[in-house]
């Protein structure tokens, strides 16, 4: 019989992560690379492991991720969101804990667009009264 697989899609900023959970040893693979190799920042790797910590399932699932768009922070947030959604498929009872930790909510904050006549989104050249 085929092994159980659980899927979830996560989004954050401009990053989209497609996540698959397979019962295993806790190995995380991102775009066919080990997570330590793909995401160099330890604090961002902690962000990725948050859903497992909240549901006390660390080391229970191997994670396979395909992520596109954004930078390290956006991709880490998208992976976290995808893992949380996939864990819901594993056990719907996780919903309460994941919701309380805020892991099921799509972070809607996006980069504000640059406006014409300004240097950045809100930065204007210095105002001179006289």
UniProtKB/Swiss-Prot annotation:
InterPro entries: Ribosomal_Su5_D2-typ_SF, Ribosomal_uS9, Ribosomal_uS9_bac/plastid, Ribosomal_uS9_CS, Ribsml_uS5_D2-typ_fold_subgr
Keywords: Ribonucleoprotein, Ribosomal protein
GO cellular component, one term: cytosolic small ribosomal subunit
Pfam family, one: Ribosomal_S9
GO biological process, one term: translation
GO MF entries: RNA binding; structural constituent of ribosome
Domain of life of the source: Bacteria
Protein family per UniProt: Belongs to the universal ribosomal protein uS9 family.
HAMAP family xref list: Ribosomal_uS9_B
PANTHER family in the cross-refs: RIBOSOMAL PROTEIN S9 (PTHR21569), SMALL RIBOSOMAL SUBUNIT PROTEIN US9M (PTHR21569:SF1)
Name used for this protein in its record: Small ribosomal subunit protein uS9
């Amino acid at each position: 019989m085929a092994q159980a697989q659980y899927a979830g899609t996560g989004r954050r900023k401009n990053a989209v992560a497609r996540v698959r959970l397979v019962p295993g040893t806790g190995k995380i693979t991102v775009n066919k690379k080990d997570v330590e190799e793909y995401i160099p920042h330890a604090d961002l790797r902690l962000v990725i492991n948050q859903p497992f910590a909240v549901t006390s399932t660390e080391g229970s699932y191997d994670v396979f991720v395909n992520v596109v768009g954004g930078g390290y922070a956006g991709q880490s947030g998208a992976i976290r969101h995808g893992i949380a959604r996939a864990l819901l498929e594993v056990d719907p009872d996780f919903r309460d804990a994941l919701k309380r930790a805020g892991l099921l909510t799509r972070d809607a904050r996006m980069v504000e667009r640059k406006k014409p006549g300004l240097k950045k989104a809100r930065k204007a050249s210095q105002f001179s009264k006289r």
